[in-house]
């Protein structure tokens, strides 16, 4: 099955992973330098051993491709993946006069009395982002994260580089180039990002009329994050292949620190008891000339019949 390589990664970490402390204070079991390969001609690699919300993957990728760094677009599409990082901008500002949100990242999980207070403040924050453009401009921006680096890389001369447009043009005109690369890791901008890029660099490769993509990911949350990353870059490969007139080849996923958080171990064990199901199929509709013209409704899956979702806390 298409997701076997992902399941083997999870088993490898449980069996051989090294325990490490981490930035979030949660603790992880991790391995270093792991590679998975997915043949995109065999189906779309969205996990079936648990339900993964494809709508969130679509809206986040389109957000990146728009060059957007403000969560307002995500909230308009009911996507809350990045909420906590923007929320922190607000609750640590001089404008915030609500309940104490110090260390909300852990208190929301560990303190049952605090959890509803946090949820109420987060709802207030989301509502204001959606209805107040000035508030959204001030507190909804995450800094120079993926969209900024992909579409508006800042040069020393004060100009910008559109890496996505450039790499698409290079695939069309110089498909054998070894420079079909997009980087999200800009050392100068890392301090100004809500979260430094986890998926840092990707490269395309054209052979036999097929487009393949390899991602280097410095850090991968294997239970929650990596399934999203696999599907997101598979979708990106499909979108660029369609614009460049190519079939899809492989998605190659290379991970630096691949880890399972200690509070995800039982969930991973549950997932590993399940049998993979047939992979869904991706359909891209609409006669779009550019990857930047796609809307949510243009991207559809068929035949997705996953096992039930498995909940787990996000480490912030």
Curated annotation (Swiss-Prot):
One of its GO terms (cellular component) is cytosol. Its main location: cytoplasm. It is found in: Cytoplasm. Keywords: Cytoplasm, Methyltransferase, Nucleotide biosynthesis, Transferase. It catalyses: dUMP + (6R)-5,10-methylene-5,6,7,8-tetrahydrofolate = 7,8-dihydrofolate + dTMP. CDD domains: TS_Pyrimidine_HMase. It comes from the Bacteria. (6R)-5,10-methylene-5,6,7,8-tetrahydrofolate binds at residues 221, 315. It is an enzyme of class 2 (transferase). Pathway: Pyrimidine metabolism; dTTP biosynthesis. One of its GO terms (molecular function) is thymidylate synthase activity. The keyword Transmembrane does not apply. Its EC number is 2.1.1.45. The active site is at residue 198. NCBIfam families: PRK01827.1-2, thym_sym. Catalyzes the reductive methylation of 2'-deoxyuridine-5'-monophosphate (dUMP) to 2'-deoxythymidine-5'-monophosphate (dTMP) while utilizing 5,10-methylenetetrahydrofolate (mTHF) as the methyl donor and reductant in the reaction, yielding dihydrofolate (DHF) as a by-product. This enzymatic reaction provides an intracellular de novo source of dTMP, an essential precursor for DNA biosynthesis. Belongs to the thymidylate synthase family. Bacterial-type ThyA subfamily. Homodimer. This is Thymidylate synthase. It comes from Lactiplantibacillus plantarum (strain ATCC BAA-793 / NCIMB 8826 / WCFS1).
